[in-house]
Amino acid sequence: MATASTSSIPAIERCAGDPAAFVRDHWAKAPLLRRGAGPDGFDDLLSLDDVDRILSTTSPRTPAFRLVKDGKPLPPSAYTRSGRMGSVPLSDLADPGRIFELFHDGATIVLQSLQRSWAPLTAFARELELFLTHPVQVNAYLTPPAARGLGVHHDTHDVFVLQVHGRKLWQVWDAAVPFPLGHQTKLPPGAEAPTGPPLVEAELAPGDCLYVPRG
């Protein structure tokens, strides 16, 4: 059973360092890259063993998880199975064998809204919500080596990227859509391919944190 994080450091400090400096200089304004934000990593929040346990033993159902490859979603029928809960038939249960087979073939595993079901992340998200006075959703992305999970895109929400395991190259450009609203999910014409050098180009290592404002 998952237990709350053992870290005594406040969640916002683990992500962004000094809270006042973060709000003054970065919140909704500019990216922030912190090397070694978690000196001991972030394994207390979610480890690779935890991901394996979630997929293999808890029988999650879509849309609590999904798979994408080269920026495109894979059909749920490719990685789900049928089952029963008592007398109720189910058709959207995780099929661990298919999931890990697709993962080794280059697909990214996405676990969604983990703050609802994984105790360490429930507590972590609640701390961030109290500081930011804003709802927090926690997703986990597990991408195999030499693969690309998502293509160039913009988000309608601010993002904290916590690198838990492995290394990943990130490129962040200036906002394509300044302060986008929730319905503004599509890039404007001509913004699909960013021009000019990125504001941030960095390979994240375990314990690093990258904050990206929406847009």
Please provide the spans of the model-predicted regions.
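Active-site region of the double-stranded beta-helix
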Residues: 2-25, 40-208
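Non-catalytic, conserved peripheral segments adjacent to functional cores
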Residues: 28-30
